[in-house]
Amino acid sequence: MTSTVNQSLDDFMGRFAAFVKEHAEAGAIEYDEDWPSPCYATDVTPESGTSIPWKPVLREQTSEFKDLSEALELTLHPDVAQFYSRYWSDNIVAQHPSGKLQILQAWNEEDFERLQQNIVGHILMKRRLRQPETIFIALTDEDDFVLSVDNQTGAVMLEQVGLQPKEQISPDLATFLDEIEPTTTD
C-alpha cells in the first residue's frame, strides 16, 4: 500500500516533534508580534525579539489552490496541495540521502498568500522557458538548486532555478517525506 502525502507529512512532523525534544533549538524561533502564527507556543508570554518555542499546527481548513489553478489554467498536482495546506509551520531543516535541505511551509495566512504568488511566478517562468511545470517544495544547500514536484508525474526532482530538472530524487512526494529526517542547521 502506498503512503499518502498527508500520512507521510504527519509522520515527518511526528519525527520533527521527537527531534525537538532532543534538540530544543530546532523548535525555537524569534518571536515577532507583527508576524502572528498559531505555531507559537501558547504557554509562554512572548516579547518581540525573544526566542520562544514553536511547533507545526494542523490547519483547520485545507486549500485546493483553486484560485491559483484557475489563474494559471492548470490543475495543481494534488500531492502539492496536500503538502502545502496540511500544516502551519516554519520551514524545517532535514536530511535526505541526496543531501541537506529545508522543507518549505507556510507560517500564517499572509505567508501562504506569498507562497502562492511565488508558485505562480515559478510556473510562469517555466512556461516562458518552455520547460515542464514544477512546483518547488524545498531548498537545498547548493545555490540556486531547489527540490520540486513535477506537476505531471508527481516525482520529486532536483532542479537548478531556470533550468530543466536535473535528476529524480524520489518517485513521489509521499516517498520523499518518508525518506527525510529532521536535522539541525549546522
Swiss-Prot record:
Transmembrane segments: none annotated. It comes from the Bacteria. This is Protein Syd. Signal peptide: none annotated. It is a peripheral membrane protein. Belongs to the Syd family. HAMAP family: Syd. It is found in: Cell inner membrane. GO terms for cellular component: cytoplasmic side of plasma membrane. Interacts with the SecY protein in vivo. May bind preferentially to an uncomplexed state of SecY, thus functioning either as a chelating agent for excess SecY in the cell or as a regulatory factor that negatively controls the translocase function. Its main location: membrane. The keyword Cell inner membrane applies. Keywords: Cell inner membrane, Cell membrane, Membrane. Pfam families: Syd.
